[in-house]
Amino acid sequence: HRLDEATVNERVDGLLDALGLTESADTLVCDYSAGMTKKIGLACAIVADPAVLVLDEPLESVDPVSGQTIRSILRRFVAGGGTVIISSHVMELVESLCDSVAVIAQGHLHAIGTLDEVRQGKSLQDRFVELVGGNANTGEGLTWLRRS
């Protein structure tokens, strides 16, 4: 469905304000920092109020204050009936935002279910490493790192 110009302008103004980008509204996106670009990408994705948002690393390069704002916006979107699909390597982010989780590595699905089902009593970080067969190398051979 097509949105009328007044609705688009109202939503854009609200998103720019919420994301702290109002003063940069006339700046070319190519001149934005990585974090600002990430925020503008979210604003572009959400302005039409889609049923589903698919976000890749939504908090990467974003400062903590903006990150909290983005989390709040995403929670509000979900509370309003929307669905958010997040791809992230930051398990703490996944644990704080997601109800359901799929662990995918090298194109293979290793686990899917609610957060608790996938974690199986562990942190999601530990469970992810367990599921994908993480490297147990702790750098013990790097003896030159010691200052003794």
Regions found by a protein language model. Name each.
Residues D49:
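Conserved catalytic motifs of ABC-family nucleotide-binding domains
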Residues L53-E57:
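Catalytic Walker B motif of ABC-type/P-loop ATPase nucleotide-binding domains
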Residues Q68-G80:
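Helical segment within the ABC ATPase nucleotide-binding domain
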Residues V94-S96:
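A short, surface-exposed alpha-helical micro-motif characterized by mixed small hydrophobic
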Residues I112-G113:
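ABC ATPase "signature
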